[in-house]
C-alpha cells in the first residue's frame, strides 16, 4: 500500500537525490537573494504535517466541507497572531503567494481598467505593481512613478504632481528593490489629495516592520499585503491586512471564491508557527542583525571605486550595486558568483539601460545570512569575497581561493542536520 511508503529515499530515489543535492547546495552556498530566507525546523514540520490532507474551502466557522474544527483553530491562531504582530483589525492568511494577495487587494479596491500608480520596475517596484507582462498591467491602467534620477530616492513632490495629472483610483506603495525607508504617511497624503485609495505591498520589509525597525504602513494603507517568507522568515505564502471591515469582507470574497479554492492549511499552520516566532523578543534581535549586516556590506562596496551602491546605501535588508565597471553586466556577475557558491540575483537599477535579462546591477540581501548566524564580521568578509571574485573573473586560482573561504564560512555556520 502507498501508506507503507514512509521511506521516500527507497520509494523515489530520484526525488530524494534531488532534494539531497538542494540540501547540500543550501548548506554550502552563501544565500544573498533578498527574497529568500531560512525557516526553522518547527515551520518545516508544520508545513510537512498531516494537514496537507485536509480541504477546507471557506473561512473559520464558515466552511463548505465538514471535519474542519481543527483547521479552524489553526487558521484562527494564524489570524490572531498576524493581527497582533502588525496591529491590524483584520487579517486574511489564505493567499498562496504575495502576487495572489496583491491580486485580491486590487479586486477589493478597484475595477478593471481603473488607473493605478505603482513603482516602476527598474526603480525597485514589483511585477505586480503594473508591469505589462503581469496580470496587473494587463487588467488595470497602470502609470509608473520612479525615483529622483540624481538621488535615486523617492521624490514625493514629483509623485504628487504625477498623481494630480493622472488622477489614479489607487496608489501602490512598496518595492522589491528599494533600499531606503518608505514614508507611508506621505503616500497617504498624496492619495488623499487626489481622492485615491492607498495599498502598500510590504513583502520585503514585513519582518523589519514587525520588529519595529521600519515604520508600519498599516495605519496609513487601506490595504496592506505581504509575503510570509522573506524577512518574516516563514513559509512561502501571502497575507493581507486591513483596518476596514467592509474592505475585509471584499478581501475575503476576492480570495475565496474569487481567485482561490481551498486554502493550503498545512502552509497556514506553518505561517502560524512563524508568526509565533516573530512575537518572540529574539526576533527583533534577528531583524536588527539583518540591518547591521546590510549596512556593513554596503559600506564595503562604497569604499571601492569600481562599484556603485545605488542611492548610496541602505536602510533595510537589501541594496543594489552597479557592477558594470568590473564585469559586463549583472547576469555575468550572478553567474560568476554562482560558480564560487555565492547566490544572489542580477537586478535592474534606476533608469536602466540594459535589458532585464542582463541588467547593470546585482541585488544583495542579508535576511538569510542573518538567520544562519552571520554577524557583521562575516558579512564584511562576504562582501570582500564578492569583490575579489568579480575583480578576478578570469583568475581560476583566485576563484578557487574564494570557494575555499566560502566553504569555511558555511561550515562554521551550518543550516540543519539530518533533514534528508
UniProtKB/Swiss-Prot annotation:
Pathway: One-carbon metabolism; tetrahydrofolate interconversion; Amino-acid biosynthesis; glycine biosynthesis; glycine from L-serine: step 1/1. (6S)-5,6,7,8-tetrahydrofolate binds at residues 121, 125-127, 246, 355-357. GO terms for biological process: glycine biosynthetic process from serine; tetrahydrofolate interconversion. Pfam families: SHMT. Its EC number is 2.1.2.1. Its cofactor is pyridoxal 5'-phosphate. It is found in: Cytoplasm. It catalyses: (6R)-5,10-methylene-5,6,7,8-tetrahydrofolate + glycine + H2O = (6S)-5,6,7,8-tetrahydrofolate + L-serine. The modification N6-(pyridoxal phosphate)lysine is found at residue 230. GO terms for cellular component: cytosol. It comes from the Bacteria. Disulfide bonds: none annotated. SUPFAM superfamilies: PLP-dependent transferases. Keywords: Amino-acid biosynthesis, Cytoplasm, One-carbon metabolism, Pyridoxal phosphate, Transferase. Catalyzes the reversible interconversion of serine and glycine with tetrahydrofolate (THF) serving as the one-carbon carrier. This reaction serves as the major source of one-carbon groups required for the biosynthesis of purines, thymidylate, methionine, and other important biomolecules. Also exhibits THF-independent aldolase activity toward beta-hydroxyamino acids, producing glycine and aldehydes, via a retro-aldol mechanism. Belongs to the SHMT family. Homodimer. This is Serine hydroxymethyltransferase. It comes from Streptococcus sanguinis (strain SK36). The gene is glyA.
